[in-house]
Each structure stands twice: as structure tokens, then as C-alpha cells.
Regions:
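Charge-enriched interaction surfaces
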Residues: 1-148
């Protein structure tokens, strides 16, 4: 799998399978990395969030920031957003308290943007726990991968 770093200051690019997309900006909204999966159904964007917390709820504004940023980076983002399946995988260290419930998307004051909340509601959520050895191997292999 290729590692593809991205930022919003370049030309828009095509979203492809076979790449692990890693944002170049610190504190990227919503996720740490993501990749696209091809299968029998619609293509799926698998979002990866590494966390030690037993909960990792988000806010509508964070979903909005993510959507806006992705629209600046990838060609045809509105079609992708509507047509692709969505998953988020919470990756946790074995010593963390496992996330066991669906993580919420909250609104603060004012009217919520239905598009942001609708996207969050479409995202299937999963949790995986990695032992220290597996986590280290995963990190090492990611570092050795070619850049796109």
C-alpha cells in the first residue's frame, strides 16, 4: 500500500484505492488517516482514528471541517461523499479501555447542519485493539512504505 501525504494547498487530486492517505497538517479534523476499499458494493472510505480514550465523541463542527478540507483536496468530492460507504475504525492500544458504544456527534448552540450530521450517521463504527508488538510492526511497516 502506498502512503500518500496530502494538504489543501496543491491542485485537487483523484481519490484512489491502494493508498493510505495521511494529512500533512497537525490536528487534522476527525481522523488520523484513511484509505479507500473496493468491493462488491460501493467503494468505502475507511477512516482511522488512533486513541487511548474510552470515548471519542465528535462535534458537528469537526465533521464540517473534515468535509470542507476534503473538498479542497480531492476531485469530485461531493459525488464521493454521497456515493461511497463510510466506516471509522477506532484503533486502541491493548492497555486502553475499549470503546464499546457508538460515538456521538454533538451540536453546540445554533442550528445543526443536516449534511454534517447525516454523514456522521452513515458512518459505520468499529473498534480494534492492538498489542504493543502488533502496533509497533504496523508503525514500522507504514514508515517503510513508498510515498505516492
Amino acid at each position: 500500500m502506498l502512503i500518500s501525504h496530502f494538504a489543501s494547498n496543491g491542485p485537487k487530486r483523484e481519490l484512489k484505492t491502494g493508498c493510505l492517505y495521511k494529512p500533512l497538517i497537525p490536528n487534522f479534523p476527525l481522523v488520523d488517516d484513511f484509505f479507500v476499499v473496493e468491493g462488491k458494493g460501493p467503494e468505502t472510505i475507511a477512516l482511522l482514528q488512533i486513541t487511548r480514550a474510552k470515548e471519542h465523541h465528535t462535534k458537528r463542527t469537526t465533521v464540517r471541517e473534515f468535509r470542507d478540507y476534503m473538498g479542497k483536496v480531492f476531485e469530485d468530492w461531493e459525488r464521493i461523499e454521497e456515493g461511497y460507504g463510510w466506516e471509522i475504525i477506532y484503533i486502541q492500544h491493548v492497555d486502553s479501555t475499549a470503546i464499546k458504544k457508538r460515538q456521538n456527534c454533538s451540536t453546540s448552540g445554533g442550528a445543526a447542519n443536516d449534511t454534517d450530521l447525516a454523514l456522521w450517521d452513515r458512518i459505520h463504527q468499529y473498534q480494534v485493539t492492538l498489542s504493543a508488538d502488533i502496533a509497533s510492526e504496523f508503525i514500522n511497516r507504514s514508515s517503510d512504505a513508498r510515498e505516492a
